[in-house]
Amino acid sequence: MNIRLSAAFLSFAAFAGLAAAPSAQALTINPIFDSTVTSSTYVAQIENGFRTAAAVFTGNITNNATININVSWGYVAGQSLGTGGLGASSAYLYTNLPGASIQYWLTAAAASPRASKAESGSSKYLAAAVQADSAYKFALPTAEAKALGLVNPVSTALDGYIGFGKYQPYTFSGAVKAGTYDFVAVAQHEIEEVLGRISGISSANPSFLTPFDLFRYTAPGVSTHSYSALSYFSIDGGATKLAIFNNAPYGGDRGDFNGAAADVDNAFLSAGQTDNVLQDDFTILDVLGYTAIPGANTQPTPTSTQLIVAHLDVPEPGSLPLVAVGLAGLTLLARRKRAS
């Protein structure tokens, strides 16, 4: 059985100014396990599995930022995942931002001495992508704002929520057993979405875009925000296809991939399947403003799935979709709900 993944959003109406960052250079993911986790029979497995999932990011990203994530079992941001969900995420966003600001911040990050070749090279294509999407305002995840140094990077405020479906069979560590889902993989998918790997394209007429949407192409030099068109992730203006985005007619996040490679960012996860955190995943975070260690360790950690509570169309036969919930103006807004 495959499961679809997706993301949710919490939004802030205003954006804070530039904040000074302490000297230490290390990403910290701070999980806050709520009572749904601490009261579960699987509390130790959930907590250990989540920390294992987070370690691949904290061990390979050097930005000085602390990302605070509320972790729930059976719920996400207070909403039940029901009986069919694997995982879900919801991120806080700074909203109503002009594309020119996103371009400026990403370009500044790319000019940093700490920027990778991928990040530095990608910035030259941002102006054209922003121009192509000039009709839209942008939303910036608070976690990404921390990585870019735009707000206090060690703020204790929540950056997002992640929840895991409690009715699915999981393998919490080691080789994934037949008929079970890889918990670490699900967690990694969700964590990366809170960090910023999300799309604002939730319908044919999106209300906003995200920085990640600036790296979406249908052909060399042709940016897109289409919900249905076959599109791909590229950091060189569309010349090179690094991964194909999900455009399944039965749903799935448009910021996820279509499953052509065994990637943690895939929109669907099958029971018994082990996907991996690949180099392309670090490239995504790199161009979004994070700094990955050169040759970041892409150890064979199972792909993680992201599921958010929202309206989800009936998935393909034998598949479970992971979907996203939207939180607008600090109000939980259902975008898609996953069917089981």
What residue spans do the PLM features occupy?
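Extracellular zinc-dependent metalloprotease catalytic-domain scaffold
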Residues: A26-Q188, E193-A310
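Short, charged juxtamembrane terminal tails flanking transmembrane helices
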Residues: K337-S340
